[in-house]
């Protein structure tokens, strides 16, 4: 039979009933179930399956490597989806442009820090009535902090933007019609 591993809290009952032949399992059970599965064929996409799970499967089972068709279908966008993606990037680009203009004009006058800069960018995004929330936590790092992967400024690590330092801001917005 088919087993689908997922976060069961996110699967409505009506959805489970629609797929009567599928056994829905909690994702956290995957490793344990794989260790106790023998002489089965698994279809996986080696481009997206973790090496950890692939090795567990191969100990007692065989694998058929098939490219995930959903992965490729996600790459195909309708004209409406493309328009919405473009609109989201244009609207978010307006906020980012205003932010960079604000930094340029206030760099010397005000004490701009990683945190105050991140807050200002959020404030500018919120001026758009279609803005919902951040796509992911904003990464706002200057100097050595700008080189830290997934850096999150705190009161302790918060640095002032200084002339000569590189400033990295990685951010995105979720709008009614799309995300950046």
What is each model feature region?
Residues 1-180:
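Active-site neighborhoods and metal-handling regions in enzymes and metal-associated proteins
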């Amino acid at each position: 039979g088919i087993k689908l591993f997922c976060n069961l809290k996110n699967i409505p009952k009506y959805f489970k009933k629609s797929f009567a032949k599928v056994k829905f399992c909690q994702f956290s059970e995957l490793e344990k179930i794989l260790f106790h599965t023998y002489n089965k064929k698994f279809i996986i996409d080696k481009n997206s399956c973790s090496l950890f799970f692939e090795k567990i499967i191969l100990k007692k089972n065989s694998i058929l490597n098939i490219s995930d068709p959903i992965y490729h279908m996600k790459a195909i966008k309708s004209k409406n989806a493309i328009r919405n993606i473009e609109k989201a990037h244009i609207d978010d680009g307006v906020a980012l442009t205003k932010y960079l203009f604000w930094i340029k004009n206030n760099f010397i006058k005000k004490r701009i820090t990683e945190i105050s800069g991140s807050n200002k960018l959020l404030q500018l995004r919120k001026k758009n009535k279609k803005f919902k929330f951040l796509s992911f936590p904003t990464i706002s790092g200057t100097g050595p902090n700008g080189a830290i992967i997934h850096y999150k400024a705190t009161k302790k690590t918060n640095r002032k933007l200084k002339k000569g330092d590189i400033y990295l801001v990685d951010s995105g917005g979720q709008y009614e019609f799309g995300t950046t």
